[in-house]
């Protein structure tokens, strides 16, 4: 699990580009692996349009490594963290984006899960990415996948892990935080908190019920009926419960009241808020800054020019 240095002369943007080309060229094989996971009731049908969206997003990123910012009396430089441990549920989209972002930022990444969800699909995708790494003479162990029953020993004893990402609901996040002696960054991706005052579009209700992970809060007196919905007296109670229980990722409100919409937006504590709309299922939000440590350099501008040739913002 040791962190491997990557040659500074390697064009990581080209590595990422080649990785996406490799994935697209192997589309038929990936589909076959995906069908095995689906047949085993151990996965979802992969949408290659989502993978193309990740490609477009990453290709727009200019090489952020060693980027220098002029911050008044000091200069701040991006440097790689080392090894990032990502504890997640096996979602292939997360694996692709996080693996390639770790390469882009010159980090190594260990994916850890206590379930083998999407196992055939994920293993094949990692093999394809590792093939590209070897083409550039980069250690293929830069990206690893581990299955463990418990995270405690991994997180409490490893001195080679520099940061932990955890993707899951609030309870899962808390479990990892307790077990870890390392800095933990939490993501509540694809966990939605929904408050319904009223909703007229039947198609939205049908789509809402297809969301994998959501808590639905319905205002008292509503004619709507959902399995396992939570009844609340008003918007204040809904916001209070959401803020207490939320994983912090996304919340949704359905209402025809401008006041309620505004009140919800201003008071609910989630990163993404949808008003009378549903997410598209690909709201990945892995901030690239989380893959770096910031180094402060204190010196005169003249010396900074010598160090970086005036190439800083």
Per-segment meaning from a language model:
Residues 18, 22-26, 104, 130-135, ...:
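ALDH superfamily catalytic-core signature
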Residues 71-76, 143-161:
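A structured beta-alpha segment of the ubiquitous adenosine-cofactor-binding alpha/beta core
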Residues 2-5, 226-234, 248-253:
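Short, well-ordered beta-strand elements within core beta-sheets of diverse protein domains
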Residues 1-74:
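N-terminal Rossmann-like NAD(P)+-binding subdomain of aldehyde/semialdehyde dehydrogenases
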Residues 15-18, 25, 32, 49, ...:
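C-terminal segments
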Residues 105, 160, 179-180, 268-269:
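Short, structured coil segments at secondary-structure junctions
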């Amino acid at each position: 699990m040791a962190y491997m240095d990557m040659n500074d002369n390697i064009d990581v943007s080209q590595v990422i580009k080649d990785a996406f080309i490799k994935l697209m060229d192997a589309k038929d094989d990936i589909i076959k692996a995906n069908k095995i996971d689906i047949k085993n009731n151990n996965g979802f049908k992969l949408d290659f349009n989502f993978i193309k969206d990740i490609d477009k997003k990453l290709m727009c990123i200019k090489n952020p490594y060693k980027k220098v910012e002029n911050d008044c009396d000091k200069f701040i430089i991006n440097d790689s963290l080392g090894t990032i441990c990502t504890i997640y549920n096996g979602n292939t989209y997360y694996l692709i984006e996080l693996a390639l972002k770790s390469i882009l930022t010159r980090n190594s990444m260990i994916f850890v899960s206590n379930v083998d969800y999407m196992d055939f699909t994920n293993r094949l995708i990692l093999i394809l990415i590792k093939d590209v790494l070897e083409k550039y003479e980069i250690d293929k162990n830069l990206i690893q996948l581990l299955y463990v029953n418990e995270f405690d020993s991994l997180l409490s004893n490893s001195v080679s892990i520099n940061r932990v990402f955890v993707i899951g609901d609030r309870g899962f996040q808390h479990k990892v935080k307790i077990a870890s002696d390392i800095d933990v960054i939490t993501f509540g991706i694809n966990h939605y908190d929904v408050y319904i005052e009223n909703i007229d579009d039947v198609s939205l209700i049908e789509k809402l019920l297809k969301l994998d992970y959501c808590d639905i809060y319905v205002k008292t007196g509503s004619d709507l009926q959902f399995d396992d919905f939570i009844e609340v007296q008003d918007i204040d109670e809904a916001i209070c419960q959401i803020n207490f229980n939320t994983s912090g990722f996304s919340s949704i409100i359905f209402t025809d009241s401008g006041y309620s919409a505004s009140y919800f937006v201003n008071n609910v504590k989630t990163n993404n808020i949808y008003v009378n709309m549903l997410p598209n299922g690909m709201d990945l939000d892995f901030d690239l800054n989380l893959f770096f440590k910031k180094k402060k350099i204190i010196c005169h501008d003249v010396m900074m020019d010598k160090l970086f040739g005036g190439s800083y913002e």
